[in-house]
Amino acid sequence: LSNALKKFIKPGDEIIVTNQDHEANISPWRRLEDIGAKIIEWKFNLDSHELQIADLENILSSKTKILAVTHCSNIVGSVNNLKKISDLAHKQNIIVIGDGVSYAPHGFPNVKELGVDFYTFSLYKTYGPHLGLMYGKEEILKTLPNQNHEYLKGKYPYTINPGGPNHEELVSLI
């Protein structure tokens, strides 16, 4: 996802990650420092172990383009209010990615209600196959550069799946 979204990043643009997240939702965004992105860390409150909206308001800027945040922290166990976070970020046209890998085993995420632009988690965390699942708003997905074979260029939705589908694992979901 970070590779596809880098088209929205110019040198000096900011990406916010949190210190509540799993490394899998931090490293891909940090790699965009190679193209000039500035990574800002939204730190949780040491007393409450929660991300504070007021702290987010203080670090958002006109240069912020992406906010990657966990729905439920595997580090401190708090559940973040993605609806409030998304509403605040969207006021500044910031793309919001919710990492649901630690939330999905405990509840069904309603991505429409959460207001996120993308939501990801690993199906094996919900006793499924070792596959990743990603929800994305179609109006953004359709604008992403091809992540698949070059001959599929421009043929959405095939352009957003790097490689082919894993049929044997997909059938296990039925």
Stretches found by the model and what they are:
Residues 1-174:
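Pyridoxal 5′-phosphate
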